[in-house]
Amino acid sequence: MIAGGAASRYGGAAKGLLEVGGRRILDRVVASLAEAAGAAPIIIADEPEARAWRRDLEVVPDVLPGHGALGGILTAVETLGPTLCVAWDMPFVPGPLLAALGAGLAGADAVVPESDSPRGVEPLCAAYGPACAAAIRAALARGDDRAVAFHRDVRVARLPRERVLQYGDPAVLFFNVNRPDDLARAEALCRSRASYR
């Protein structure tokens, strides 16, 4: 689970500690990752207080601090090898979707789900293999810390939108809480469907 970035759009607050439907977003993501991987997730974070967020989980600091989510992905693949990466501010990512992404790593270096975003994929809910590490380091050396900056240099497979739709609406699945109005929207989504609780 990547708990990176300064959360500047949320006033610097620890977004994963906010509650949606009576549960912290962090706990929602942990449950989905554990369901998909069959093991306890690891938190990638540079925050000194990160160990207190979930005392039952290991916390690994970024290998290259200050590079946001891409630094978190780098840390995950260099520390863990093949891994599922999910941003800690995405309250509605289901475990079965993550399992499908992980299964795709057999034939690719990265597996990203197609989304409705302008870039067409969601790189902060994806599976990454160790071959991504060198490409991420090269992107960071170029000064490019976008989460997709290294995709052109590795074998990327896409989980087609049709498959993503089997798990729900991509606009909800990949919804992230960046601002107070996003939290209000997440609460409304949670009330609207039992599957989002």
Q: Which positions does each model-derived feature cover?
A:
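Conserved anion/nucleotide-ligand pocket segment
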Residues: 175-177
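Acidic, Mg2+-coordinating catalytic module of metal-dependent nucleases/exonucleases
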Residues: 180-183
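Nucleotide and nucleotide-moiety/phosphate-recognizing core
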Residues: 1-144, 152-173, 188-191, 196
